[in-house]
């Protein structure tokens, strides 16, 4: 629908409103269009839930999420246009489409905040009920929206020349082009369908290898063939899509970290430890007997954790000079607004500051009163204080470098670290205080993540001429509905990837027993118990115990578990959840004072050395921490992006055009399709259909595919043909055009 009152828009011009002193939105402030409508809110909620599901899966696998605003914008335009044709109604306005992406984008940020923190409770031996996840997500999400409201004018309006908010600007570009020329969602749907089909064939039917690998070996002086290193790639559509979106530079840093881990650290530890006859803590066996996976789990894991922690804190310190100016600017704006009766234009109306104050107060009361959170006054004060600080930081950082590069985990590590140190200083070192620290971290992490997404949405609204108050209401809807779903998704994925491993610890008696909970292994019924602290060599965790509460089996969580093979011989792929592992390591290590500080400091100084070289340490550190199979596939996606960009004009390689191009839209479809099919396969993994066999076991055709199922080379060729080549062709504009 054309808007006659607007100045002509050059579809090829850069619409970042930084060059002129007076900003002119696409929809004038005096123009009233349909915006906050039930249809827009409902569609935003539905699309938000879809992308929240994919974000949960992606964050659990690799500790990363990507912005959902652009694909949601494209889908909204197409869906509303289709509904308009079949119903004979007027097409949706640009402000309604903006409301859809505003409401829908909240799900991705809530998912990131929750997944980065709360699964750490599983590693410390606790259950993670969906009600706790939902409560923390709702409170943290609402805090993120409320605390961002006083900062909107200072950051989005007053600093529009310095804070570009790239994803928000790109989403506005898509909305405006869709308003003028129409946008087809074929590109997103094509990526979604291809990814879902590929994921089903590879991860469900197992027609060919999902994680092909090559092992480097050499002849040792003893005459034995020993491991020298290995490289593997989890050739999945969602990781390929992530690599394309983040680009070759960041994807290359991630892969460099993986190479450092698998080709330097692991071989070095193996070489220096091969002749040792004593166990080197925190390892549980001789280094000579360990393979690459065991060396990584026992040693490199802590080096990577130290590197990620230090890199996150470094990225946070870099933004320190901007924190004070943003905070003081927000209060100054509110002070200037008091005592004046001048009517503000529609495009500058926020929710009243009184509503913000009441909303924050309600969140504080909920944190103290709700049994699912149940924190004390000191903890609530820490949560609100850290949330306000990092909401400001998050908004500024996303304005400078985008939401995908926002160091949310660094802010959360800082929160958990400082909280744990405060608890240690006042003597709060019991198991319950670890839960308290992680709950505070969860609230702050969700608030910071939501604030970053809120900033991008408000930037989009600022460009297209939306009403901030209505956007903020839409965000409250999106945050709340997504939060209620995410807890159930985490439980489902954890259960589907959980393994039961035979373990025995003589003399250890488990005192915490789940009332009414039981499980059966080989026809024998066991009770379910928990150790929340190491006891007699048995680490904190969930166990199956007999009537005397003696341990028989470890229930290894699907999220961040370490034992992929079940007692039945079934092998599952664990969800690494790297950020949650770091949170558990930090809070448990500080409060129990058992951190392997030597390895942690090696990682920390490694990050510092990388920074001194002028390289951003955070993506390299995350690469050290992640399995190389993950970073290698993202790197391949980045390489495809690089190949595409070599054939594009210079002006189309960066900025809004690059962030909303067909390759990015296709990659968004790859991420959503692969992740949602992964969730579906997780359901099949726990659905018993034939005696004691699951649906996933029934559809597995591994035994019938011969060489295709075992050849790493064939798997790589098929990956290139089925995913990499189509992505390159779409990125070049050879199919599935978005405009």
PLM features: residue spans?
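Alpha-helical multipass membrane-protein architecture
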Residues: 1-739
